[in-house]
Amino acid sequence: QPNPDEFVGLM
């Protein structure tokens, strides 16, 4: 499961 922190990095 992807971490929220990494998802923010994509943004």
Curated annotation (Swiss-Prot):
Positions of post-translational Pyrrolidone carboxylic acid modification: 1
Highest taxon of source: Eukaryota
Tissues expressing this chain: Expressed by the skin glands.
Compartment(s) where it occurs, according to its Swiss-Prot or TrEMBL record: Secreted
InterPro entries hit by this protein: Tachy_Neuro_lke_CS, Tachykinin_dom
Example of a GO biological process term: neuropeptide signaling pathway
Keyword Lipoprotein applies: no
Keyword set, alphabetical order: Amidation, Amphibian defense peptide, Neuropeptide, Pyrrolidone carboxylic acid, Secreted
PROSITE patterns with a match to the protein in the record: TACHYKININ
Any one cellular-component term (Gene Ontology): extracellular region
Keyword Secreted: yes
Residue positions where Methionine amide is found in the record: 11
Family: Belongs to the tachykinin family.
Annotated function: Tachykinins are active peptides which excite neurons, evoke behavioral responses, are potent vasodilators and secretagogues, and contract (directly or indirectly) many smooth muscles.
The name this protein goes by in its record: Kassinin-like peptide K-II
